[in-house]
Amino acid sequence: MTPESPTLAALTKLSSAEEIFAFLGVEPIREVLNSSRLHIMKRFGAYLRETDMTGLTEDGIFERARDALLRAQADFVASTPLKEKVFKVFETEAAKRKARFVGLETLKVIKS
């Protein structure tokens, strides 16, 4: 990420998902945004952090940011927040469920 970028600086000043979508010219899928808003924004931030923007023009940075938002939204079109496990609480819950699982092969039959 390139913090000196006017595009990225402007993104940090926006306060709502709707403002971010409008700034990047992305039409939100309303039902997805309404049910997964925080998850989309967190995933968008993760995609931005992992994107190398070194040497890109301002237009290139804008396009990469836009692509990151489109990708983040798309993740929740075909999936759910629970399946995507964006937040630690979901990861922890999945680990607990896995630990509670007892496979049939571990059970022993005791004859009396």
Curated annotation (Swiss-Prot):
Annotated protein name in UniProt: Nitrogenase-stabilizing/protective protein NifW
Lineage, broadest ranks: Bacteria, Pseudomonadati, Pseudomonadota, Alphaproteobacteria, Rhodobacterales
Keywords: Nitrogen fixation
Function per UniProt: May protect the nitrogenase Fe-Mo protein from oxidative damage.
Biological source species: Rhodobacter capsulatus (Rhodopseudomonas capsulata)
Residues forming coiled coils: none
Record keyword Plastid present: no
UniProt xrefs under Pfam families: NifW
Domain of life: Bacteria
Family of the protein in this entry: Belongs to the NifW family.
